[in-house]
């Protein structure tokens, strides 16, 4: 596509601000590449450590001719009391870092303003993660629109909107176990108070910060969403109406990763050799393997991880189990060794201790299901790969995502988790699904019942729709065009 310009000489220049958490950064880097492929100049503003995680993927994009720049800002470690070098949430070993981290990432406004003054061509638009409310002030100072990126589906965004407009719903609940029906929804969706998305019900110190997020949300020009219209049409339509039409569904953005190496290194370099992993998968029957990954900041206690492992073992299904934070999980390492678990499952199970090449694995013909924490990136990757999902939500938006997959799309099975895994209270919460529950859920997902076969058919159909959405003429491809036309017209009127 020819370069899109905002007047006779300058191309549109979008400046992207990803939040420093893996699940937020990965899709933002994909969005950067998608926009650069349309001829835009792109600048990504982040910290040195986070930039290094995407160095290889972005360098390949730049070498291919895409106009992407990366600028660094330094976090004020000493001012907020953060350990030097702690630049990403998945590096946390304690929730004590959360408040100073949120403060720190929002104290770089002055540095960013200096960067903006030197940028050429002049920035036309900001795309900012919703966790960085300071970018609203930058947008206002330089008189450019700010587009928000939440990293959630439209069902979840609509849920947050409805609950913010109707605060009495949560206030009137008698306990954290009481269910309520989300009003004004196309489907009957029931949640408990702890299951609602994060910024609608936040106890303690984070409340003030969340209020800043809500205010920044209100003043944003629009929202870019990593979903596609055919996946959740009623929710896309209703959420778009709440934003006066300024909501663009452009996903699945992960599909911009076409080369094998880009799929393998999406987000971080893998801790397993790609060829070794693919060779193992090649040895298994088609659609027989369950892929198990509970995200980059999984906080399940040791007792629950043991039950998960034993349930996978007793299911007799081949599986890949990704265990992130392996180096910090000394007790689990000891249990694997001393209990003989690793030895017993070696012919049927593959353990990946660290980061996995998830996109490569999910798209392999031997994989037939995905046990996921329902983080939106993973959920959408599973849907895009045409896989039925076994849902195990942990916190934040993940219970809403489970409702979408199991109830609305009919392409998933619940593991049976009812309670979020609160940081700092993991041991107290303990086991939510025992080994028998794991075994039963795996069999329900991977078995040959009529319901299981119907889920597989539905999942395959959704995967095909996902790929069509990003092709030329597809809904997401067209929505990127509409977004760029909107910003171009705005830039011309400002000029």
UniProtKB/Swiss-Prot annotation:
Top-level division of the source organism's lineage: Eukaryota
Q: Which InterPro entries match?
A: UDP_glucos_trans (IPR002213), UDP_glycos_trans_CS (IPR035595)
Keywords assigned: Glycosyltransferase, Transferase
Extract the GO molecular function terms from the UniProt entry: glucosyltransferase activity; UDP-glucosyltransferase activity
Task: Kindly identify the residues recorded as the active site.
Answer: 24, 129
UniProt-listed GO biological process terms? saponin metabolic process
Binding residues annotated for UDP-alpha-D-glucose, in chain numbering: 23-26, 355-358, 373-381, 397-398
Known EC number(s)?
2.4.1.-
**Family of this protein:** Belongs to the UDP-glycosyltransferase family.
* Designated name of the protein: UDP-glycosyltransferase 73C25
